[in-house]
Amino acid sequence: VQSDAPEVRTAAQSAIETIEGRLAVIAQFQNVWYGLSLGSVLLLAAIGLAITFGVMGVINMAHGEMVMLGAYTTFVIQELFRAFAPGMFDLSLLVAIPAAFLVAGAVGVAIERGVIQFLYGRPLETLLATWGISLILQQAVRTIFGPTNQDVSAPSYMQGGFEFLGLAITYNRLWIIVFTLVVFLALLAVLKLTSLGLQMRAVTQNRRMAASMGIRTGYVDAMTFGLGSGVAGIAGVALSQIDNVSPNLGQNYIIDSFLVVVFGGVGNLWGTLISALSLGVMNKFLEPYAGAVLAKILILVLVILFIQKRPRGLFALKGRAVEA
């Protein structure tokens, strides 16, 4: 039965506007969720860089390859489970996390001891050396595993999703956010509650004073680089669940990682957290209007303008410097 009564049309129009308004609100909250998800990925990729860059002042262009090594470690672990324990495949990620940390951490220590320790105070040479190392690692992985994407599967508890108040939430993104927070809190505990963390904070604030107090800055540098690289390897485990595992995986995140670290404040983990989540949400809100590429460009421009006004980032570390 159709009716042209004005009150019916008015009621229908009002109902349509209400529904459209509700859908618009849900879409905005969906963008926030996507932004937090992207921010957690950026945080995982950047948090290790925040440690090494903050303590050592080293621009490590091979940081993305530590992420890539973590992803390939996950692939190898899953292949071993498929071959020898297919019934326990859901445990593969739990095994891959410490394995990726050890592999990437060991490579990081080797890079610091073998190359970077001879280049402190020479930022251009360090940048070029680490860029060369990144190319070597990419080619080594490409030679061993091939140039094509590798199949890394999600365990059963990370498949599927659910709807909450109209929001579409996938389990893999949800688990990555939870995992990111756990890694972040674990790193805070290491920095605040351990002897190594105390020494790292001392070297970050004033390297010369720390050395004069008997802290072995060379040892701290090696352990810091290993810790930062290990955390990047853990990030690779998470990224293997949402991105293609290829030799170029790390290159997709290295620029964003530096952007997060510089925007948040070098060496400040809380600044890195807020920076990553903020940039992730901003990116997802800009994408519907500007597109994915232009959104990244706009964010880069905004960060550059912000750094010009506040060169030390959102949260600058406090410390006393000794002038030469």
Residue map of PLM features:
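Pore- or pathway-lining transmembrane helices of multi-pass membrane proteins that form conduits
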Residues: 65-69, 119-142, 249-262, 278, ...
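Single transmembrane alpha-helix segments in multi-pass membrane proteins
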Residues: 32-77, 110, 114-125, 263-269
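Cytosolic-side transmembrane-helix boundaries in multi-pass membrane proteins
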Residues: 125, 129, 144, 148-149, ...
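Conserved hydrophobic register position within alpha-solenoid helical repeats
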Residues: 9-16
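Loop-to-helix entry region at the N-terminal start of transmembrane alpha-helices
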Residues: 30-41, 92-96, 164-186, 221-222, ...
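Transmembrane alpha-helical segments in multi-pass inner-membrane proteins
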Residues: 93-94, 98, 225-237, 241-303
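Helix-loop-helix "hairpin" substructures at the membrane interface of multi-pass membrane proteins
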Residues: 168-245, 274
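Alpha-helical transmembrane segments within multi-pass membrane transporters and channels
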Residues: 87-133, 140, 274-279, 310-311
